[in-house]
Every structure is written in structure tokens, then in C-alpha cells.
Amino acid sequence: MQQFAKDILASLEIKMTQAQELMLKNFCDIRTGTANPNILDKITVNYYGATTFLKTLASISVSEGNQINIKPYDSNLIPNIKKVLLASNLGITPQTDGVVVRLVFPKPTEERRKALMKEVEQLSEKTKVAIRNVRREGNDKIKKVELTKDLETFYLNQIQTLTDKNIKLIDKQTATKNIELSKA
């Protein structure tokens, strides 16, 4: 039974880490005025009848810190890429010179920065709720396992320690993202 409790603890740790990683991935989607090529990861282009990820059809690079350059391997794709980027809700109008498609990210206004910080806080809070739900799930499983009262208390304390550690880490990552946004 004690091994089962250890397995529950390991499972909870994995779930909490996954929730935290999802939050960090969502943080990457929040634009800070600096160019991040990861925002193009989900963009697909129609390439000779097949839907293909943009990153496989073009060389993507960052220049000047606030500009993404997309140089397709086949220059005939430029109109398709431009059309897809316009429809992608990135909030940026692509510019092209016939060889390269450019996305220029403007610095956010003070009002926009505050809205982005609010979004970061909401993502952070959702992640904390997810971690607390994982904790509750773990506590319920531990209570169902037939353990001595001392062992049950020990594992419940372990779960709480794991939860506290993850919540502190989320707070730290949120503060870092907010600092990044305030400097943008």
C-alpha cells in the first residue's frame, strides 16, 4: 500500500508540472513587443493542396529584436503566407518585398501592457486552481488507500509541500513575466 501512495505522489508531481508547463507555453503567446518565432508554431499554409506548418516551408528568423523575417523556400508561397498571417489573429499586418515576409511587432502602449499583465495574472490563477484540484484529487486517493494514520498524515503533508512548491514557482514565473511586460 505504501508503494501505491508513492505512485500517487509521483503522478501528482507530473500533473502539477504539466499544468505549470502549459502556463509557460501560454505566457510565450503573450506578446511583449519583442519578436518570438514560437507564435508561428501553429500557423499552417496550404501548400499544393496539403496543409503544412509554416515553419517547415520557410526559414524563420528574428532581427532587430522586434521583427520576424519569414523567407519561404518557394517564393510562390509568399501570397499564401501573407493571407494566412492576416487571417491568424496575430494582430500584425505582414509586409513583404517579394522575397521575405516581415512581421514588425510594435511596442505595447501602457494600456495594452496593463491588459497583458491582467491576462498573465488570469493564466496564473487558472494554473493555481488546476494545481489545487490535483492536490484535492491526490488527497482523496490517499484517504481511500488503507494506510496507518501516521502514514496518511505523512503523505497528505507531502502533497501539501508539493503544492506549495509549485504555487511558489508559479508566483515567481508570473512576477518574471510581469516584469518583462512592464519593461516592454
Curated annotation (Swiss-Prot):
Gene3D superfamilies: 3.30.1360.40, Ribosome-recycling factor (1.10.132.20). InterPro entries: Ribosome_recyc_fac, Ribosome_recyc_fac_dom, RRF_sf. GO terms for molecular function: ribosomal large subunit binding. The keyword Cytoplasm applies. It comes from the Bacteria. It is found in: Cytoplasm. The keyword Cytoplasm applies. Its main location: cytoplasm. One of its GO terms (biological process) is translational termination. Disulfide bonds: none annotated. Responsible for the release of ribosomes from messenger RNA at the termination of protein biosynthesis. May increase the efficiency of translation by recycling ribosomes from one round of translation to another. Belongs to the RRF family. This is Ribosome-recycling factor. It comes from Aster yellows witches'-broom phytoplasma (strain AYWB). The lineage of its organism: Bacteria, Bacillati, Mycoplasmatota, Mollicutes, Acholeplasmatales. The gene is frr.
